[in-house]
Amino acid sequence: WTKTKNIELIKNYSKWFGLRYELLYFYNVYGPGQILNTKMAAVIGIFENQFLKKKSLTIVKPGSQKRDFTHIDDIVTGCYLAWKKGRQSEYMLGTKKQYSIIEVAKMFKTKIRYIPSRKGERFKSSIINNNAYKHLGYSASIDIPNYIENFISKNNFS
């Protein structure tokens, strides 16, 4: 509800005061500088932190939850393209490819441990409108399997 009201307010400010805007939605952003170990950490940051500490990766049951993971460099590119076009529109920035949490955890090639499901856990998160591809020429160029493979090769201290 709050997000909807904020969007409504932004659009009204545009009408009332000529405010220029672009509304961008990000999907599970990962990459350099991400949060690794607080309540605000996303799944890739959590997995990286656990991997570096040689701990089992924790997966919220059932593990089949699907997400679209987007690298920060692709997000920055999408933001720039939206700013450059200046269409006063909404864009969803992602890869259009989903992976289950268990698939991502297995990419780290380490031990996995399941933890109980949480109330309110989303089962699926995906882009439902690809207007960023159509209107901005946006296309994600970094995929999560390659990112994780590079992360492991840089940080595998066996």
Give the label of every model feature segment.
Residues E48, C79-W83, A105-F108, I144, ...:
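Hydrophobic "lid"/C-terminal helical patch
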Residues T2-K5:
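Active-site helix of classical SDR
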Residues I72, S100-E103, R118-N150:
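Conserved C-terminal active-site "lid" loop/helix of NAD(P)H-dependent oxidoreductases
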Residues I7-P32, T58, I112:
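Conserved beta-loop-beta element that borders a ligand/cofactor-binding pocket
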Residues F26-V29, G45-T58, K66-Y91:
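Alpha-helical substrate-binding/gating segment
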